[in-house]
């Protein structure tokens, strides 16, 4: 072949050998190694990675070492990795294992993380009985990328015993390793076939994995806490909701926000647990809790919101008023009207929004009828408070009432009527 035509022709032939995988060409290709032509060398190395056997391991190992175990023009390192995988597939397990071990040691010394990862992947596949041991060894490494690669590879063979050993390892690990493991456990739990295994996992008969994860919430390192919280959210065991809600009672704003985000994402009923912690939380925790009740539209917990309106700080009161519209229902109409008619100026708008929300499921005509009756009870001095509510109904009868208020009203009443007309969504008010 070395005498067959031009260099281009030779390269084309070598590429064809690689594509068709002509195993008999291995010895001829080995003779062609060491070409000063980088492109020719690249083709030969690639071809050997496709057609070679254990007989070519030492040759490609030397080429990879010369390349510094990194990507370069000849592709020697990639070719060597591919050949080791091929040798493993051919059933020469011991040879592949030996080569992978050697590559792992030398690439580690060279600081080539990607090559280390590739070697580890082969090693895990070559020796399944030692896979857990090799995984735990990798988790002791100082390179985060390498640790995470090991965990990702482990996803392919992880079972109950692997999860137990990894979580046991986590108990004694440094914070950065704990974070990697916790994130991995969370990802694993999202796999339908693995979810129940992880949810019901026990490290021993008196130590469920759930408790191990909950204990990480007490870790001094915030990132460990964060990773544990999200693992718990992904696992979705509803029994941990009260513990997550307790994060709202923290004095650390960062932890409060973590708890809020976790509860917001949790697929389950968080309302009662959140309502329970609000009274004893700091102002930041109270506000986070009120926002959660609003997001979850927790109308069964209206009283919790009302309590904060009565006794909270100015910031908490503002959050409670803002939440009000999302936690009310039709039955709260009379209560809200009473609050509106006695409210301070700053509370008028959120109370109006709450009334609009409370009656929003009624037919528009019924809304107008109910509001008109309440306006009569409120008296002339308070009628204007309901113009915004009437405007939200979109009913012509309501429009007439607002226009009348604009024409006959003075001061605040006239301003309220004008604002209501400006907020009208139809063209009738134009």
Predicted ranges, named:
Residues 1, 8-23, 28-34, 41-53, ...:
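Structural detector for internal amphipathic alpha-helices that build alpha-solenoid repeat scaffolds
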Residues 64, 95-103, 209, 337, ...:
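HEAT/HEAT-like alpha-solenoid repeats
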Residues 109:
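Solvent-exposed loop and edge beta-strand segments that line ligand/cofactor-binding
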């Amino acid at each position: 072949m070395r005498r067959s035509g031009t260099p281009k022709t030779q390269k084309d032939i070598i590429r064809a050998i690689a594509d068709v995988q002509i195993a008999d060409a291995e010895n001829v290709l080995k003779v062609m190694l060491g070409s000063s032509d980088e492109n020719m060398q690249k083709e030969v190395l690639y071809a050997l990675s496709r057609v070679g056997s254990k007989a070519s391991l030492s040759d490609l190992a030397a080429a990879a070492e010369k390349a510094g175990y990194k990507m370069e023009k000849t592709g020697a390192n990639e070719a060597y990795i591919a050949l080791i995988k091929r040798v493993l597939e051919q059933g020469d397990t011991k040879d592949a294992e030996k080569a992978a071990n050697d590559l792992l040691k030398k690439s580690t010394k060279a600081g080539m993380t990607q090559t280390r990862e590739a070697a580890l992947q082969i090693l895990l596949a070559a020796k399944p009985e030692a896979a857990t041991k090799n995984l735990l060894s990798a988790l002791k490494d100082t390179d985060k990328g390498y640790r995470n690669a090991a965990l990702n590879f482990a996803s392919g063979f992880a079972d109950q015993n692997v999860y137990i050993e990894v979580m046991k390892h986590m108990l004694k690990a440094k914070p950065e390793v704990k974070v990697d493991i916790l994130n991995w456990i969370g990802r694993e739990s999202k796999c339908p076939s693995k979810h129940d295994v992880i949810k019901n996992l026990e490290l021993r008969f008196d130590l469920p994995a759930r408790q191990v994860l909950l204990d990480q919430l007490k870790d001094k390192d915030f990132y460990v806490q964060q990773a544990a919280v999200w693992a718990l959210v992904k696992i979705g065991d509803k029994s941990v909701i009260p513990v997550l809600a307790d994060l709202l009672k923290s004095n650390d704003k960062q932890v409060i926000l973590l708890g809020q985000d976790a509860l917001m994402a949790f697929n389950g009923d968080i309302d009662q647990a959140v309502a329970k912690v609000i009274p004893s939380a700091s102002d930041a925790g109270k506000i986070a809790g009120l926002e959660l009740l609003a997001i979850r539209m927790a109308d069964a917990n209206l009283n919790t919101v009302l309590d904060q309106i009565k006794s909270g700080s100015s910031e908490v009161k503002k959050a409670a008023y803002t939440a009000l519209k999302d936690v009310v229902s039709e039955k709260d109409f009379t209560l809200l009207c009473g609050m509106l008619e006695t409210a301070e100026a700053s509370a008028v708008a959120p109370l109006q929004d709450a009334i609009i929300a409370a009656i929003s499921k009624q037919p528009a005509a019924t809304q107008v009828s109910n509001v008109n009756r309440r306006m009569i009870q409120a008296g002339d001095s308070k009628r204007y408070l309901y113009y915004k509510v009437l405007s939200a109904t979109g009913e012509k009868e309501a429009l007439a009432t607002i226009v009348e208020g604009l024409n006959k009203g003075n001061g605040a009443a006239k301003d309220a009527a004008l604002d209501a007309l400006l907020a009208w969504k139809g063209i009738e008010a134009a």
